[in-house]
Amino acid sequence: LNILLITSKNKKGYSVAMLDGIKAASADYLLIMDSDGQSNPEEIKNFWKNRKKANLINGHRANRKDYMYRKLYSKLAFFIYKLLFNVPLKDPSYAYILMEKKVCYTLNDFKPQMPDGFFWEFNARAKSFGLTFFNLDIIHNERYFGETRIYHWSKLPLVSYNNLLGMIKIKFFD
């Protein structure tokens, strides 16, 4: 098993860190999965079984286990996202994705416009390159450890505003 740990002395933010990992990927496929315990590693075999169906196999939290306020903000963002980008995904923000190597090469060098919405942006950019998607229903668990820091209810209005601005920049100015 070839695993590469990418570290930095400086805090670079989630989106830049994700891009660094994607740039470093060298295998034929790259699997990205959040490590907060909400995504079941057993699902990896389902991603692998479906790997030939599209360039990106995107997890969809079929039974999303999150606070109501997060689901509401997510639904509103999804509505705007669909209007702007029409990406054929049920859950474009979910960090559980299997992608081909060509996706890594195609989408590893952009300046993130949505620092707290990396996968929203990544999937919108993938669609603009004509890449294909497959939705894979995933059983979503409650978070095992800790609380979200960035998506806390007190920070969500600012995060949502910044992500909306990012969507507008990507759609009209990028």
Task: Show which residues each predicted segment covers.
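Acidic donor-binding segment of Leloir-type glycosyltransferases
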Residues: 1-6
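Acceptor/aglycone-binding surface of glycosyltransferases and processive sugar-polymer synthases
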Residues: 8-24, 29, 41-116, 143-164
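A short, conserved beta-strand element in the Rossmann-like catalytic core
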Residues: 36-38
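Catalytic donor-sugar/metal-binding loop of nucleotide-sugar-dependent glycosyltransferases
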Residues: 114, 123-141
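C-terminal, non-catalytic tails of nucleotide-sugar-dependent glycosyltransferases
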Residues: 161-174
